[in-house]
Regions:
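Long C-terminal interaction/binding lobes of large macromolecular proteins
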Residues: 129-198
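Conserved phosphate/pyrophosphate-binding and hydrolysis machinery centered on Walker-type P-loop NTPases
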Residues: 19, 38, 51, 63, ...
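Cys/His-rich Zn2+-binding cysteine-cluster or related metal-binding knuckle/ribbon modules and their
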Residues: 2-8, 17, 27-92
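Residue-level signal for pocket-adjacent positions within structured domains
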Residues: 28, 43, 56, 68, ...
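Extended interfacial segments that mediate partner engagement and assembly in macromolecular machines
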Residues: 26, 75-143
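Solvent-exposed alpha-helical segments within well-ordered globular domains of core cellular machineries
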Residues: 9-13, 27-31, 42, 46, ...
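Conserved, well-folded catalytic cores of nucleic-acid-processing
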Residues: 14, 18, 36, 51-54, ...
Length: 198
């Protein structure tokens, strides 16, 4: 027997399908939303729809933005000759929080994972190689220290090495299997400063 009505169960199921939201959190959110004033729920749903409609990939680095270029790629004070390669926009945000990295980024939107059927053509590698035709001096590979992240880093290193562009990998200090988005700013900064050439 279902404890809640069809509408409540459906809302809980939809919320529980979001990453990082378990069943208890989904229930808590569902009850909160149901008890919110209708105008606030309407505003929230409109904001979600607007974001879905207007947010897209930056045409340069592939982070999420609502303009053609993200604020980082538009910023002429950034060092456009240094590109940090990250797996996702959350990792980019983690490095930006350090306030120390002055280059630009390239977001892969994933990592190579043969076990999951994700190959090099399934992430934004072709776009990265295209960017290297510009005035790029260094590529910093800042993928996660998971098996997939390490595989991706090695693949990128082998791909770029023949171009003569300096390729570095962030230092460890980031625990093996750790996701960058959960690492504190000091550890990320030390990993960036201690990067090694591939």
């Amino acid at each position: 027997m279902d404890l809640y009505s069809g509408y409540i169960n459906k809302l809980i199921d939809e919320l529980a399908a979001l990453p990082g939201i378990g069943n208890k959190s989904a229930q808590r959110l569902a009850f909160h939303l149901i008890n919110m004033p209708k105008d606030k729920v309407t505003r929230l749903s409109k904001t979600i729809l607007d974001a879905k409609e207007h947010v897209r990939y930056c045409k340069e680095c592939y982070t999420l933005t609502d303009d053609e270029l993200c604020p980082i790629c538009r910023n002429e004070k950034r060092d456009h000759s240094t590109i940090m390669v990250v797996e996702n926009t959350r990792d980019l945000a983690a490095y930006e929080k350090t306030g120390k990295y002055e280059g630009v980024y390239h977001v892969l939107h994933g990592a190579i994972s043969p076990m999951l059927g994700i190959g090099p053509s399934d992430i934004k590698l072709k776009e990265l190689i295209e960017r290297l035709k510009g005035d790029v001096q260094e590529v910093i590979i800042a993928t996660n220290s998971s098996l997939e992240g390490e595989t991706t880093a090695m693949y990128i290193g082998k791909l770029i090495k023949p171009t003569g562009i300096k390729v570095t990998r962030i230092a460890s200090g980031v625990p093996v299997g750790g996701d960058l988005e959960y690492i504190d700013e000091v550890t990320l900064l030390r990993a960036l400063e201690g990067r090694t050439e591939l």
